[in-house]
Amino acid sequence: MSLDTAEKQKLIENHQVHPTDTGSAEVQVAMLSKRISKLSDHLQGNIHDFASRQGLLKMIGKRKRLLSYLKDKNVQKYQELVKKIGIRG
């Protein structure tokens, strides 16, 4: 499940570090979280869609690695992001 351009732009605006930021860890985690949420909803109704399930697990792993990186680099930003997105809690 991909995000349309308007959704991506809204996520970037809400999580960017500076005005031209499109690829910081915060933005990437926010986009992955939104995609994970959409794909989880899809898998609730399509339990035999194993290809999508595998993609979901890959996205969860990537988000976990990005969050780990962010936690190592800046704990305060990590905590703010986790609270803002509503994960880990």
Swiss-Prot record:
<keyword id="KW-0699">rRNA-binding</keyword>
<comment type="function">
    <text>One of the primary rRNA binding proteins, it binds directly to 16S rRNA where it helps nucleate assembly of the platform of the 30S subunit by binding and bridging several RNA helices of the 16S rRNA.</text>
</comment>
<dbReference type="InterPro" id="IPR000589">
    <property type="entry name" value="Ribosomal_uS15"/>
</dbReference>
<dbReference type="Pfam" id="PF00312">
    <property type="entry name" value="Ribosomal_S15"/>
</dbReference>
<comment type="similarity">
    <text>Belongs to the universal ribosomal protein uS15 family.</text>
</comment>
<dbReference type="InterPro" id="IPR009068">
    <property type="entry name" value="uS15_NS1_RNA-bd_sf"/>
</dbReference>
<dbReference type="GO" id="GO:0022627">
    <property type="term" value="C:cytosolic small ribosomal subunit"/>
</dbReference>
<keyword id="KW-0694">RNA-binding</keyword>
<keyword id="KW-0687">Ribonucleoprotein</keyword>
<dbReference type="InterPro" id="IPR005290">
    <property type="entry name" value="Ribosomal_uS15_bac-type"/>
</dbReference>
<feature type="compositionally biased region" description="Basic and acidic residues">
    <location>
        <begin position="1"/>
        <end position="18"/>
    </location>
</feature>
<comment type="subunit">
    <text>Part of the 30S ribosomal subunit. Forms a bridge to the 50S subunit in the 70S ribosome, contacting the 23S rRNA.</text>
</comment>
<protein>
    <recommendedName>
        <fullName>Small ribosomal subunit protein uS15</fullName>
    </recommendedName>
</protein>
<keyword id="KW-0689">Ribosomal protein</keyword>
<feature type="region of interest" description="Disordered">
    <location>
        <begin position="1"/>
        <end position="23"/>
    </location>
</feature>
<dbReference type="GO" id="GO:0003735">
    <property type="term" value="F:structural constituent of ribosome"/>
</dbReference>
<dbReference type="GO" id="GO:0006412">
    <property type="term" value="P:translation"/>
</dbReference>
<dbReference type="GO" id="GO:0019843">
    <property type="term" value="F:rRNA binding"/>
</dbReference>
<comment type="function">
    <text>Forms an intersubunit bridge (bridge B4) with the 23S rRNA of the 50S subunit in the ribosome.</text>
</comment>
